[in-house]
Amino acid sequence: MAAVKASTSKATRPWYSHPVYARYWQHYHQAMAWMQSHHNAYRKAVESCFNLPWYLPSALLPQSSYDNEAAYPQSFYDHHVAWQDYPCSSSHFRRSGQHPRYSSRIQASTKEDQALSKEEEMETESDAEVECDLSNMEITEELRQYFAETERHREERRRQQQLDAERLDSYVNADHDLYCNTRRSVEAPTERPGERRQAEMKRLYGDSAAKIQAMEAAVQLSFDKHCDRKQPKYWPVIPLKF
């Protein structure tokens, strides 16, 4: 008898109540809770905008110039004067604290805001307690292939980014030679400036290296002073073979 009742209950139970769809319904309820809190926050923002003391109906505000373009200057001036002379102006609000017409609405909205804030706190606490259980998740062959393909794409993208960075670092502008180093760094230099050049001159000229290096420096300074005043850019060496 019990087996018959169990079989009938399984037959009458809808298909979407199967435990396989538990995670789906869990995510659905979380999304609906987020949407409800979003609607509540939007409604609170609109109510706070319309219930502020400085808000007045549209009949008391200056009309747009598109309503009456011919009488725009005078009508705008009249509305502006009426707004200043109106007893419910900003100075009146500052003296009385708030408009009597909207005081009851503000109090009611404050109570509603407190109730909504409590509901949102309860929703956030319940959302924090919810955890996704992945122990019963079935790992199929298609899912394994998907993960492997994703990892392969990530590795290819990482390798391509490294190649692009190396190509950008090794790029030489047309007005620079191959030994021009334009990199800047805040780290201390690995070797003393001119040490490599001094060792090369010592190897080439022996004891006369210092004298020849001084002569080269003098010639270079003279060239920079008299001949290289405007420092023209070198024409890029491009083979013109069409």
UniProtKB/Swiss-Prot annotation:
GO terms for biological process: spliceosomal snRNP assembly. The keyword RNA-binding does not apply. Residues 135-168 form a coiled coil. Pfam families: GEMIN8. Keywords: Coiled coil, Cytoplasm, mRNA processing, mRNA splicing, Nucleus, Phosphoprotein. The modification Phosphothreonine is found at T124. Residues 110-119 have a biased composition (Basic and acidic residues). Residues 120-130 have a biased composition (Acidic residues). The keyword Cytoplasm applies. Transmembrane segments: none annotated. Residues 94-130 are annotated as: Disordered. GO terms for cellular component: cytoplasm; cytosol; Gemini of Cajal bodies; nucleoplasm; nucleus; SMN complex; SMN-Sm protein complex. The modification Phosphoserine is found at S117, S126. Its main location: nucleus. It is found in: Nucleus, Gem; Cytoplasm. It comes from the Eukaryota. The SMN complex catalyzes the assembly of small nuclear ribonucleoproteins (snRNPs), the building blocks of the spliceosome, and thereby plays an important role in the splicing of cellular pre-mRNAs. Most spliceosomal snRNPs contain a common set of Sm proteins SNRPB, SNRPD1, SNRPD2, SNRPD3, SNRPE, SNRPF and SNRPG that assemble in a heptameric protein ring on the Sm site of the small nuclear RNA to form the core snRNP (Sm core). Part of the core SMN complex that contains SMN1, GEMIN2/SIP1, DDX20/GEMIN3, GEMIN4, GEMIN5, GEMIN6, GEMIN7, GEMIN8 and STRAP/UNRIP. Part of the SMN-Sm complex that contains SMN1, GEMIN2/SIP1, DDX20/GEMIN3, GEMIN4, GEMIN5, GEMIN6, GEMIN7, GEMIN8, STRAP/UNRIP and the Sm proteins SNRPB, SNRPD1, SNRPD2, SNRPD3, SNRPE, SNRPF and SNRPG. Interacts with GEMIN6; the interaction is direct. Interacts with GEMIN7; the interaction is direct. Interacts with SMN1; the interaction is direct. Interacts with GEMIN4; the interaction is direct. This is Gem-associated protein 8.
